[in-house]
């Protein structure tokens, strides 16, 4: 992707910004008219901290979070969020009074599993799901099912960008939402209005980034 095609959306909070490109893009489950580039938020410490601080503002000090499950390569943000939660005296039930930060393992069928040595950080714990985005909900659903299966409790869902404020009965909070992106839309591939107009796909996107098609 050419950097000149990227638009930066700034906010009042230092280092809290969003980089986007308008166009016609395909994910594994939908077609979207914005590519949201979260590379820097996931890898640059200053921006990861800004996302963590923004997400923290949505939670009450009575929120209990024992474990943060990081999806979509969100480990740096998850670590920053754990630090913010700990330094702001949020409750957790862990005997060591700190927070687990985990990344899931996926089977070949994209199912989330936890090995025996990781299960103690899930079973009986209040687990916050942290994703890059919550749009179709497929990734969040897989995490919810895994946490429940292994005996954990979902404490909520957080993301850099989300199109919903509730998913499967769990609160979703995000640093950015469609109000920040004029005309944002997401459609099932067979219902995509851009495809029906004959607009060519510009690229494939996933949690790793963007692959240009032409």
Where are these regions (language model features)?
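Active-site-facing substrate-recognition patch
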Residues: 1-64, 207-214
């Amino acid at each position: 992707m050419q950097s000149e095609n990227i638009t930066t959306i700034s906010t009042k909070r230092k280092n809290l910004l969003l980089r986007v490109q308008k166009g016609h893009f395909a994910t594994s489950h939908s077609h979207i008219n914005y590519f949201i580039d979260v590379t820097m938020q996931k890898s640059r410490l200053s921006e990861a901290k800004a996302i963590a601080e923004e997400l923290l503002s949505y939670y009450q000090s009575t929120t209990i979070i024992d474990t943060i499950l990081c999806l979509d390569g969100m480990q740096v943000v998850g670590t920053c969020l754990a630090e913010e939660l700990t330094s702001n005296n949020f409750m957790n039930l862990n005997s060591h009074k700190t927070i687990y930060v985990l990344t899931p393992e996926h089977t070949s069928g994209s199912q989330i599993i936890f090995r025996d040595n990781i299960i103690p950080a899930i079973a009986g714990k209040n687990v916050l799901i942290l994703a890059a985005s919550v749009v179709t909900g497929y990734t969040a659903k897989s995490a919810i099912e895994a946490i429940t299966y292994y005996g954990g409790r979902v404490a909520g869902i957080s993301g850099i960008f989300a199109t919903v404020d509730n998913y499967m009965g769990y609160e979703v909070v995000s640093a950015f939402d469609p109000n920040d992106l004029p005309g944002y839309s997401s459609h099932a591939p067979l219902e995509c209005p851009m495809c029906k107009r004959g607009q060519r796909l510009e690229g494939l996107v996933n949690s790793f980034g963007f692959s240009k098609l032409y």
